[in-house]
């Protein structure tokens, strides 16, 4: 005691005195407590109990002495708080007192720290100081953060996680035992059951106790998930076998595996009727119907890709969906639709949208009990036990609002993504497609599904994307990019001025002006009147050039030049001949003019070109396919009126060619593009381009339908993703509606019936009468025959059967006024 400081010695002496007083005289305290309680309690037993409780409360055994082992200190303390204070003040010190020591000099410890807080926290490991107590279990901790971390194990969520993890491990052990016994052919028998007396299907009875492998009931703590025998059937009816890597086999239903023998002979009355098949493992199925996972069944083919995705294992689908929503919560993804987001959506949910597996994964991420409270719409798909036992993510109202706002922004971005792509190609397609694309995910379409009342909905989320995709108006003030000012002024003015802005700009003034005609991608073309067709430059220009050359090199031969000009004039004037029925009477002038010479010149000069409604067609262009004309009673007359001037043109051209070949100028008078030549006629017959664009081509160009296959596939994928995002919003906010929709889709999926070649008839009162479908088919066939009679098919070209002939069981589509038919002219 000589080495103690005065303060420590006084502390020690006071502590020893108090302890000796407590140890030497326990009776007075007992007497006082007994006296105090005797006045209030009437019974002697109450006196004894009260005195005993007061003794246990007041009496404390002396603490174990603590020796300070910092260098050669050697001081002895009996209170951990005093030891800790001694180490911090005397040995560690402070910077203000100029005695700070950041190296622990406790016996056998040389830890160096950077700050005083670090070393004072480290000193606690050398003292039995644990002032922080847990109110639940009474454990003590040195630091408050340790106590806070420990208190988490007493929460309800942590207990659920522990129970779920224990159940999952037990299910994995049970499955490994069953697989092990199946692989070795029963060499290691299962633990005996209480129902072993009832042998089933000739299986031998197992002994009550095996020497090497005791029963599971002997060690109940080793198998916490195995319930008592009365609940054994319930334990094995749970989808615990879906942890099997063989659960994706095609020959067994999803999430199930063949039941071992001990399952059957334990409860024979449960499996007596259908124990020899796998169908009893799928609840709610008729034993006579085939499972949808059978690849040879008709139902499997009807479901297509959805069932094949489910066969790949629902566990991976659960993980992908959970990873998607986990990244969404952690804000690892931006609400912008691009190629990466499209690929992520396709990998997570597939091309079929939300199916049973995806819906269960979405709902299990928020509330596992809501996922399996009802039977799934697809009975062949069993819920995964791993997902069923997976802890639910804590879903707060703010989290749901953020999730909905993210999906709303993503859907609006996907809806405007197609319009932004199509606007780069053409203005007409952008105007039509932007309206259609934004209509897929606008306020009106979302309000039809009740999505305008979900948490986090804001109309501005949809308006931002739509306004960005709209582009700049024609009469809007031009931005700096469209003005003629230098780029140095861009830093002075960031925001684009509006018409109602009265502030002075810091840079040069922006002059309001109209945008150029091609600012929005609009293309303008001049449309000529339909009274006459434009002259063909391929025929007219070479003739003029040839005349000029002839006039330069043959000035002495005026008669030949006049004859050649007469032939050229007759050829050019024949292009401006009307083919209307009213002008068909004028078609005889060319024949007379070609045969009579001077009389032909007079006839050609006197006859002026007609200004009828129909355009004038040259013989070269007449060989092409003309726009179709409505098939009615006037079809034959119209085709006759069209063919008559064409034949007269051909005969006149042949006469001119034969006459010019006899003359000395045969090399000039033979036209290069004469329709009488076989090569040109074959080329003209093979040409399928019409003179004017059809209505379908123009409408498809305006709506963006005439695009490449890649753009069409991207557009189809984008539309599927817009629908997928809308379905996700419905599934998250209205799970019951999503289940009902999946169940309805599952019941609605059917393949079309196989058509037979025998036409159906109705039998009424012994006589056979044609049905309405047959009347429509016969009417359509008669229309088709009328069209073929009115437009003869050239020889050598096969005639294809009509659609109503191929599908004789389906009613033919009635013809509409705007239907186009190709009219072929026999030239």
From Swiss-Prot:
Domain of life from the UniProt record: Eukaryota
Keywords: Activator, Cytoplasm, DNA-binding, Metal-binding, Nucleus, Repeat, Repressor, Transcription, Transcription regulation, Zinc, Zinc-finger
Annotated localization: Cytoplasm; Nucleus
GO biological process: positive regulation of transcription by RNA polymerase II
Pfam annotation, one family: zf-C2H2
Renumbered residue ranges of the record's region Disordered: 1-60, 153-174, 233-275, 370-392, 535-688, 761-827
Zinc finger (C2H2-type): 66-91, 102-126, 132-154
Cited SUPFAM superfamilies: beta-beta-alpha zinc fingers
UniProt GO molecular function: DNA binding; zinc ion binding
Biased composition (Low complexity): 7-54, 160-174, 237-248, 578-593, 603-612, 628-646, 664-687
Function: Transcription factor that mediates regulation of both acid- and alkaline-expressed genes in response to ambient pH. At alkaline ambient pH, activates transcription of alkaline-expressed genes (including pacC itself) and represses transcription of acid-expressed genes. Not required for the pH-induced dimorphic transition.
Family of this protein: Belongs to the pacC/RIM101 family.
Protein name as catalogued: pH-response transcription factor pacC/RIM101
